[in-house]
């Protein structure tokens, strides 16, 4: 009986230790170049260079649409509001309105 008990305790201990151990597998990257599988195609030579992106030319009739949540706050004195109020209102109507822009 004591031999069976000792064997069962050893078995449980080995099972518990196996849960704590991480398994590691060596992939093809660990192999030397002579042992690597040759299933891959060699890299293509003479690839075309990526052309530099062109800078877009902005024309007068181009329209840019943008919709994003944002917060806009402006602090003006009464004199500044008298001077810039109509222009500011026109800018806000153009930004927040659905009609085409008017300048």
UniProtKB/Swiss-Prot annotation:
GO biological process terms, semicolon-separated: G protein-coupled receptor signaling pathway; growth hormone secretion
Tissue: Expressed in the telencephalon, hypothalamus, pituitary, intestine, liver, spleen and gill, with expression strongest in the intestine.
O-octanoyl serine-type lipidated residues: 29
GO cellular component terms given for this protein: extracellular region
Propeptide: 49-103
UniProt KW Disulfide bond keyword: no
Statement: the UniProt record of this protein carries the keyword Cell wall biogenesis/degradation: no
Residue ranges, annotated region (Disordered): 27-51
Pfam families referenced in this protein's UniProt entry, alphabetically: Motilin_assoc (PF04643)
Family indicated by similarity: Belongs to the motilin family.
Name of protein: Ghrelin
Annotated organism of origin: Carassius auratus (Goldfish)
Gene that produces this protein: ghrl
């Amino acid at each position: 009986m004591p031999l069976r008990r000792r064997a069962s305790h050893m078995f449980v201990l080995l099972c518990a230790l196996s849960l704590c151990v991480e398994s590691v597998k060596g992939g093809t990257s660990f192999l030397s170049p002579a042992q690597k599988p040759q299933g891959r195609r060699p890299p293509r030579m003479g690839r075309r260079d990526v052309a530099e992106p062109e800078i877009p030319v902005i024309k007068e009739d181009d329209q840019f649409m943008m919709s994003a949540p944002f917060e806009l706050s402006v602090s003006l004195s009464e004199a500044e509001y008298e001077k810039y109020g109509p222009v500011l209102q026109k800018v806000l109507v153009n930004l927040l309105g659905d009609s085409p822009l008017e300048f």
